[in-house]
Amino acid sequence: GESLTFSFIIDSRNQDSEILSLCCGVGIVNGIKEFTHLNCNLKWPNDIMFDNHKIGGILIEKKKDCIIVGIGLNINDSNLNSEIKNKATSLKKILNYSIQREPLLAYIVNNIEQLLNYKNDKIIKMWLSLCNHINQDINFYTTKNKLVKAKFVTINSNGEAILNINGKKEVLQSGFIQ
């Protein structure tokens, strides 16, 4: 197989979905580092990056009594289609060798499982240390696809982006950074 895609369900009574997304990002990056010694980064809200190229992402779907987490990673993909080739990459392309998916999955799941026991402020600190665009000028697209030029300052205790837009701090819950 070329990619690694998996899902799991968490009881939402014990977990906050925003923090869970951050927790998964940190767990994935730590799992990749432990297994391959590769230092990946995180891009808000849920992208796994290497050298400004996307390796994978996290999707969180909140239901009434549970949270469904979906994770997808480009592992051994060597022929990414031309539309995404400039923006995406795979572990195989970076490392020049094929990766065994099952052991990598075990490292990632073990890391996420450990992080689920951490306090939110520790997860946020870990996430911030792995984020590649703190205090950087960014192009931010709102959910209405409106482009906002801003400086990414940090995230708050809910995992929301705090941006500096024309000298004014704004909190944004959703959208994406280009």
Segments predicted by a language model, with ranges:
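Conserved active-site carboxylates
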Residues: 47
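Catalytic domains of carbohydrate-active enzymes, especially glycoside hydrolases
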Residues: 44
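Long, positively charged amphipathic alpha-helical accessory segments at protein N-termini or as interdomain linkers
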Residues: 12-16, 22-40, 50-178
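Structural signature of FAD isoalloxazine-binding scaffolds in flavoprotein oxidoreductases
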Residues: 1-9
